[in-house]
UniProtKB/Swiss-Prot annotation:
Homodimer or homooligomer. Adapted to the low-temperature environment by a decrease in the oxygen affinity via an increased ligand-dissociation rate. At 2 degrees Celsius this hemoglobin has an oxygen affinity similar to other hemoglobins at 25 degrees Celsius. Heme b binds at residues 64, 95. It holds the Pfam family Globin. Keywords: Heme, Iron, Metal-binding, Muscle protein, Oxygen transport, Transport. This is Globin. The keyword Iron applies. The lineage of its organism: Eukaryota, Metazoa, Spiralia, Lophotrochozoa, Mollusca. Belongs to the globin family.
Amino acid sequence: MSFSAAQVDTVRSNWCSMTADIDAAGYRIFELLFQRNPDYQSKFKAFKGLAVSALKGNPNAEKHIRIVLGGLGRILGALNTPELDVIYKEMASNHKPRGVMKQQFKDMGQAIVTALSEIQSKSGGSFDRATWEALFESVANGIGQYQ
């Protein structure tokens, strides 16, 4: 799926505001993901056996959260370019062995959209939920085609 220049600008702008406090945003994303999908926590080696409340301050959790958010940053940087397909293939290859499939990417997208919406609401910034939802549908489909 291709996104308009305005949509790309919107998601990148929202992303930049989130990265101002990336640790807090990352913890919120995973808190939402695991509250909604408790069984997903076992798919993350760094989070296994941790209470969701214990993610903050855990160096293994922090490291993995930054890896996940870094991957999303790569996707946003590659929107509407051929590089995006390369990233999708890599993510599919990295996640399939752990049973992380298209649905899990959709669910992660929902957690990210909710967290970003909260962050934008607190900062008074605009948030185009429909564009973000379309983006994560596209991401899940893009990765899913290689699984």
